[in-house]
Each structure stands twice: as structure tokens, then as C-alpha cells.
């Protein structure tokens, strides 16, 4: 029986999660909240070879972000030691953009510093021991944002695994700068269209919630 390549495995994972492949870009997309398709999409870009990379950009609630990380973890069993969370800026090598924002009273605030420190203090030692990613994502909410499950966040996240380079890969990544550019600003405007989160996911899928969000744009 022929063994699937890494690219084929990632393709199958994306499809099983309900993503549709965009013919023009080659990215996988999934609408999360009906009616807000311009604001909420995931972008998966699988690569073949030794590096397993899955990237996405999303405007979403923090709780939903963690749920998605857990969902990805379940679908990528066998790659769990290769799923790393980065938060920083564009580096010469590798070329990766990652940033995360949330808002308080409509004022964007970067979380890169907190997330990076969280990785250094907590996550990094566990990766050496092939720690489960699900525990990491749970801890981000429980330890850092216990009362912020309904916080809107704008995120660009990048998962990458390279067996050859291993944990030494952290050294350069953690030197990333926390700079915002024009593309960041344009994206930040989009997640403000999220309807109110009150713990009931079905409520924000309703017509009333969607219409209310459009009026606030």
C-alpha cells in the first residue's frame, strides 16, 4: 500500500476540516461565521518535503481560536511534536509573519510579547519531551486569559516542523520584532465586525447578530 506524502496528508487534513481549496491561490478556506465571509477565513498552505507547514490568518474569538488549535491537533496526530506556535515579525530566514492582537474598548493591543514569554517560560521545555500541543493551547487560555474567552483576536499563526533543525530553531525566532505594517492595519479592521460573544456560539450565527455586526462596521 502506497504511503501518502506529507503534502497529501496535509491536503486530506484540510479537507476533513471542511476547507475548500481556492484554485487561484492554492490556499484552503473555510467560512466560520455565516455572512461574515469577508472578515473570517482561514488560510492553509501545505508544503511538501521535510518541513510540515500550516499557516492561517483569522479574525476570531480567543476561545474559538483555542478550539481550532485543538481540532488541528486531533487531525495531525503524529505531527504533534512538530506543531509550534510563533508570534513575532518577518524574519530573513525563515520568511514568516506572525502577530496577534486583541482589543479593549476598541484599542488594539499586541500580544506578541506575552505569547513569546509564555513560550520561553512554559512551552519550549515541553517540546523537547514531545509535549502534547493540546495542553499548550489550553494553557494559553487558562493561565493567561482565564476570563477572556470572548475576546476578539486577529491572528496570523504559522505551524512549522523541521526534524533536522530541531529546538535550535527557537533562537532566531525569539529575536523577532513587534512591528505593525499597513497590511496588519487593514486586517485589524476586519475582526471588529465580529458579533457580540456571550458564551452562546449559536447566538452569533443568528441573523440578528450578523446584521448588528454589519451596522457596526
Task: Briefly describe each language-model feature range.
Residues 23-29:
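Long, charged, glycine-rich C-terminal linkers/tails
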Residues 2-7, 29-217:
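Intrinsically disordered, low-complexity regulatory regions enriched in serine/threonine/proline
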Residues 1-23:
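Amphipathic alpha-helical segments
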Amino acid at each position: 500500500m502506497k504511503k501518502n506524502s506529507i503534502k497529501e496528508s496535509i491536503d486530506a487534513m484540510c479537507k476533513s476540516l471542511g476547507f475548500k481549496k481556492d484554485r487561484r491561490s492554492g490556499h484552503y478556506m473555510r467560512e466560520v461565521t455565516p455572512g461574515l465571509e469577508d472578515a473570517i477565513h482561514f488560510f492553509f498552505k501545505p508544503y511538501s518535503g521535510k518541513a510540515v507547514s500550516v499557516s492561517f490568518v483569522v479574525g476570531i474569538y480567543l476561545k474559538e481560536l483555542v478550539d481550532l488549535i485543538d481540532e488541528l491537533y486531533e487531525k495531525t496526530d503524529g505531527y504533534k511534536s512538530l506543531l509550534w506556535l510563533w508570534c513575532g515579525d518577518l524574519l530573513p530566514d525563515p520568511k514568516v509573519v506572525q502577530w496577534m492582537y486583541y482589543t479593549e474598548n476598541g484599542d488594539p493591543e499586541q500580544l506578541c510579547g506575552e505569547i513569546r514569554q509564555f513560550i520561553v517560560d512554559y512551552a519550549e521545555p515541553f517540546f523537547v519531551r514531545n509535549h502534547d500541543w493540546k495542553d499548550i493551547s489550553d494553557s494559553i487560555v487558562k493561565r493567561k486569559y482565564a476570563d477572556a474567552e470572548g475576546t476578539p483576536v486577529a491572528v496570523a499563526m504559522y505551524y512549522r516542523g523541521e526534524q533536522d533543525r530541531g529546538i535550535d530553531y527557537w533562537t532566531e525566532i525569539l529575536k523577532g520584532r513587534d512591528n505593525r505594517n499597513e497590511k496588519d492595519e487593514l486586517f485589524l479592521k476586519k475582526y471588529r465586525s465580529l458579533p457580540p460573544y456571550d458564551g452562546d456560539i449559536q447566538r452569533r450565527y443568528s441573523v440578528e447578530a450578523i446584521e448588528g455586526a454589519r451596522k457596526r462596521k
